[in-house]
Amino acid sequence: MLILVLAVGLAAAGSLLASRATRLEVALHTSRDDGRTLVIVGIDDRSLAPEGTTDFGDLSDEHGARADLILALRQQGGQIRAASIPRDLLVEVAPSEYDRLATSWLRGPQAFVDGLCRSLAMPVDHLAVMNLRGFVTLVDAVGGVEVTLEHPLRDEHAHIDLPAGTQRLDGRTALGFVRSRQGEILAGGTWTPDPEGAAGRQRRGGEVFRSLLRQLPRNPVHLYSLAWQTLPETSLSEGTSLLDLVGFHDLSGGFTGVPVEGGQDAEDWVALANDETRAALSQAGLAGGCGV
């Protein structure tokens, strides 16, 4: 009887939580094998930014939601591997029609997943989308994220000024950290533009996501509380549940960087996939094929 009561209670709780998330209208291109791919998208929608939005840009300068951070996780053979996908990567969103992943979201989630499939052969079994406000809430709810900097990093536009070394960032600082595009590092006593460019932004986003995944609570009560706070700022594809998301928390297979051609600075803002791009995605199990 106790087991039955617990089962009913958990089912009811799951149903209640699911109702707090928006459902995405999108036809996913799922895996052709027994593996699963989860794609997490952090969208830059200034209308849904946290309080004090001037820290992250003027609302009047931005229209519509863009894919700002993109993380792909692959679960297969008892391992979970992940890769941070460059937002400036050019993909085919429709036959002979191209767009950057970031701005493809302006067309809707269908164009985004079609682009991943057509250009990268990346299936998507689960899609989770979170806005800026939700990102800040999530980071604060898990007690911040731990990052390590080789050099001090500052970016006036992202409102960050961080020392070298290992440190814990709160939600607002973590958001500035992953969104920094005009950062400077202190090396040899001189502040110089961050030599990593867009690749550094990709790496920082991956570092923060890894820290978040490691810190997701295992206790069901704590997990429920976290989900209750963040799901209103989240959109999920049909058939994607909280348990599906939690199932990807352990990156036992490691994290893969995704090299691209171009897209490394403000003057060169379009990145192209090349053989190294496809090899990295294949290594992570993320290019297993799909059908549009």
Placement of each model-derived feature along the sequence:
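Non-catalytic, solvent-exposed segments at the cell envelope interface
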Residues: M1-V292
